[in-house]
Each structure stands twice: as structure tokens, then as C-alpha cells.
Amino acid sequence: MQYRKIGETGAEVSLLSYGTGGPSHFGQKTGLDDSGRAALVNRAIDLGVNLFDTAEEYGESEGMLGRALKGHPRDTYLIATKWSYRRPNGMTTDPKTAIRSIEQSLKLLQTDYVDIFQIHGVRPEHYDLLSEIFIPVLQQLKQQGKTRFLGVTEMLSTDPKHYGMSLCMERHPDVWDSVMLKYGIMNQWAAKHALPLAVSTTTAVLNMAPVRLTLTRPEKLSERMNEWGEKAGSKALDWLSDGNSSKLISKGYQFAAEPKEITTVISGTSSIAHLEANIDALNNNLPTNDLLRLKSEYGDSASYD
């Protein structure tokens, strides 16, 4: 397992980290029980994974993760969780919601602190008000030792060009230790501005869902390629994978981890076999010719899925 640094914090994170969101929601949607989750986490740690990402919005995943990590020394892994300011009728303006959220997260995760406390799904049009209201309380939580670092995550479905994350880094580079965005074969837009900005502000980049959902579902890939004028549809990337779906996913992870600006690539699965395959993929680099062709053909891509 390779490790990269979280900005200027000095903390090191595994190149592949584990996410409890995604389609399976840490096995909540696939019938995995607590013993299965513990086995998954144990295997991840055995293979060198040291960052586990969760959120208050991921069903019961925080409590499940807390139980799965029990018995592992707290200083051997990192936990990132998220709090959402968004509400059905807009956004909350009560700073106490962030305090209540982290207190509940700490209880469920059975820990005294999290390593990264993130604002979940920041929309660029909300950022000015959001930062004015919530940055002071988040900094207070950091000073109190309830979180080591502060981060923000994007709302990819409405912001595939990462304006929100770029705005966060531009406005408050001294506040945010990390941003979470998507960079992959089907969404390379971050390379134009967000990734260079992360370098200049020494901000860690957590790469979420780099192969989901397009590379894992031929019908989605066909739909997206048809939109982009690729007549080959779902076979447009057969040159990369020899038509093998598992190989395409591995290539997708390799592409996602290639930029040095990327700190870690988050993988969410309820399958130990899939986890092992994703980690194994990152033990190899994508061939230079493949990398250059993907950047040449899809460098302007900004797919929300």
C-alpha cells in the first residue's frame, strides 16, 4: 500500500481508503451483518487501509463502523465523517447543528475524536453564508480536540465542475485541510483548476466514487458515450479493458490515483473480493500510452455519475 500526506498536516493516508456510502452503504443494502462488516474492516486494515469515511446521512453506518473498528488501536486508523447543513426547505443557519452532529458521531463511532470533520455536499451558491455562520464553530470543535482536521465535500450531481470545492479553497485555504471531489476517466474536469488549486493551497484531495456508476454499468456507459457522440457506446473503452468489465474498473482506479494531487481514492463495497481487487489495482500504474489517450479523448469530461 502506498501512502500520501494530508496536505500540511503531517498525517499519512493510504492511497485507497474505505467509504461507507455508495450503493451498498456498508452492506446495509446488501444484507451484510455486523460480523461481515467486521471481517471487511479487518481485511482492509490487514491490506494497509487506514482511512474510513462515513457520514451522518449514510443510514446507520457510523454506528456500524464504530463496532467494526472496535479492538483496533485508535492511533492505527483515521476516521472521516460528514455533517450536512442542507435541509428539505433550504439550509440550516443554526451553528449548534454542527455541534450536535459531531457529538452524535463521536458517540456512534465510539471515539473521542474524528480525524476529519467535513461539511457534506457544499453548494457554491450557499458558501458565503455557510462559511460566515459555521467556520467559527468548526474551528472551535477543532480547538476542543473533537476533530483533528476540517474538510468539505462537493455536491457532484449539481456541481460536476467542482466550483464549490474551488471556492472553498480560494476563499479559506487556511481553514480547509481537505476537499472531497470526483476525478476519474469520466470526470477529468478537476485537472483543469481544482487539482492545481489544491497544490497551491496544500489541500488534501479525497477522490470519491471515481468508477461509479458509469464504468460499472454498461448501460450507463453506453448512455453517456452516446451523449458525447461516441458511436461505440458501451464498447468505447474496450481498447482499454479488452471488453472485460473487471479490468475496466481496475483501470479506472489506476487512472483516479495517478495525479499526485490526489491524496486518496475512496472505495465503497460490501465485498472483500472487490476490496482486494481495488487495492491490487493500485499496486500497478496505468500504462503511459493508456493514460495519455484517456486524457486526450476525455480530458473535457464532466460527468456527474
Please give the residue ranges for each predicted region.
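N-terminal binding-site loop/beta-alpha segment at the start of enzyme catalytic domains
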Residues: 1-77, 137, 143
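A short, structured active-site edge motif that brings together acidic residues
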Residues: 75-89, 119, 181
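Short, acidic/polar
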Residues: 31-44, 93-109, 158-169, 248-253
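Conserved, mostly hydrophobic/aromatic
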Residues: 6, 18, 44, 52, ...
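Short, well-ordered coil/turn segments that N-cap beta-strands
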Residues: 11-16, 48-50, 73-77, 111-115, ...
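Active-site groove signature of glycoside hydrolases
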Residues: 106-125, 129
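Beta/alpha (TIM)-barrel catalytic core signal, keyed to glycine-rich beta->alpha loops juxtaposed to Asp/Glu
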Residues: 3, 122-305
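Active-site mouth loops of central-metabolism enzymes
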Residues: 22-35, 83-99, 121-128, 157-161, ...
